[in-house]
Amino acid sequence: MKGTQTKEKQRVALVIQYLGSRFHGWQWQPNQRTVQAEIENAIAEVLGETVTLHGAGRTDAGVHAAAQVAHFDMVSPIPASRWVDILNARLPEDILIRGSAQVPLTWHARFSAQWRRYRYTFYTEQRPNLFVKPYSWHYYHFPLDESLMQQALNPLLGRHHLAAFHRAGSRRDHSWVEVQSTHCHRQGPFIHLEIQANGFLYGMVRLLVGLLVEVGSGKRSLENFTEIWRKQQREAVKYAAPAKGLCLLRVGYEEFPFPPSLWFDSQPLFLFNQVLDSSLSFPNQSLPYGMTS
């Protein structure tokens, strides 16, 4: 019909940061506060219709994300680049949209992803610290040896059947995972463990960390740790590490429309760096609030 504007479907990708403490995970659940539901509701408010947001990873309740990736489809003249401001004006304080861009309809936040990277953080001082408590496991009961923990992680590199670190309730029909890299290092009173894989099993990182601390504290041998996951002894993995220490750090794609500056590779290290910084100096004379010398 003459004068009618044709509207074509477009796919919008988002880079999302959130604090997981007050969420019941990423994925929509009835009568629960979830990240997916909050963002879907905000988008629906603008478009006047329901949408489905597809995430690269389904983080558990209490798990944080520095750069979760998701996409949704719309038939709207709104430019994809505007969704950062549109959504941030409507979302709660514990969710932040860091980037938005149009992607091909063949691109998928979950199925186009080649890898995901998680970081788990321990805080090992005996006295608690309120500024890092929401983002780390306060583990001070026994000294942790990060070099032993790294040695335990090394055999995980490659493609393995990791049923020992697979929680019940998953819809995934297999437990094969290709672990691409692991890194465990100390930063003052903090120990950071990073693991990158093509995908992760339900609850995998927290179960792995829960067993790994037994190696780091000298309660379990390297050989026994390896034997447990190689023989798929799920019953031997009794404890999952607290969710608050875990952060989805980054998702990797062959083609991605966002600049590298959106990746928070330093997250959550930036916070811990400030806590550790003893070189801060303060002027003798106080300045008015908001002013610097």
Curated annotation (Swiss-Prot):
The active site is at residue 60. The keyword tRNA processing applies. Keywords: Isomerase, tRNA processing. The keyword Phosphoprotein does not apply. GO terms for molecular function: RNA binding; tRNA pseudouridine(38-40) synthase activity. PANTHER family: PSEUDOURIDYLATE SYNTHASE, TRNA PSEUDOURIDINE SYNTHASE-LIKE 1. Belongs to the tRNA pseudouridine synthase TruA family. Homodimer. This is tRNA pseudouridine synthase A.
